[in-house]
Amino acid sequence: MGFARLKISTRLALLLAAMVLLTVAIGVVGLSGMRQANAGLNTVYLDRVIPLKQINLVSDAYAVDVVDAAHKVRDGGFPQQQALASLEKAKKDIADNWSAYLATELVPTEVRLVRQFQQLKAPADKAVQTIETLVRANDTAGLTAYAAKEMYPANDPLQEVLGALVQVQLDTARAEYEGAVGTYQGTKLFM
């Protein structure tokens, strides 16, 4: 029995069923593409945007809060208690944001940079402790000498690694975006 021999009502029912199936298939493909795009956006936000902020807060704590406290105490712009509070806040910000960053999904390049950071963190933390000790002792001359000769060599290599981690966030977010564009193009071709 051929298609031509079917009653018109049967042919219309089959045509309608085919159209419904095609519409459902297009909808499923569209939803799948949207799900993939949403997952990519979620990854970009949770594993790139938030970590970018965390890395910047760690960087600022070392490069701005600690260094600024040392210079302001040395120059007389910060009373001792304010400098100590700033140093404590910097240490807390570093610990909180670094541990939160480590809880995200790291790509292989990040893992390598995190290892580098961990090695450089000990001397930078020692520098923070030394600055804190000098501030507690009201040793302005010692703080001036330390800031001039030892503070930056302990901090600068750390900043380079943090800068590289920022770049990894941007590069990985770009790659995720390009993947989403590819998914969109593939879905668009199907539809």
What is each of the regions a protein language model found here?
Residues 40-126, 130-154, 174-175:
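Membrane-proximal N-terminal soluble sensing/regulatory segments of transmembrane proteins
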Residues 155-166:
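Extended, hydrophilic extramembrane loops/domains of integral membrane proteins
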Residues 34, 93-94, 158:
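Hydrophobic residues within well-ordered alpha-helices
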Residues 21, 119-121, 161-162:
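Intrinsically disordered, low-complexity segments enriched in polar/charged residues with Gly/Pro
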Residues 1-53, 59-79, 98, 132-135, ...:
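Hydrophobic membrane-targeting segments
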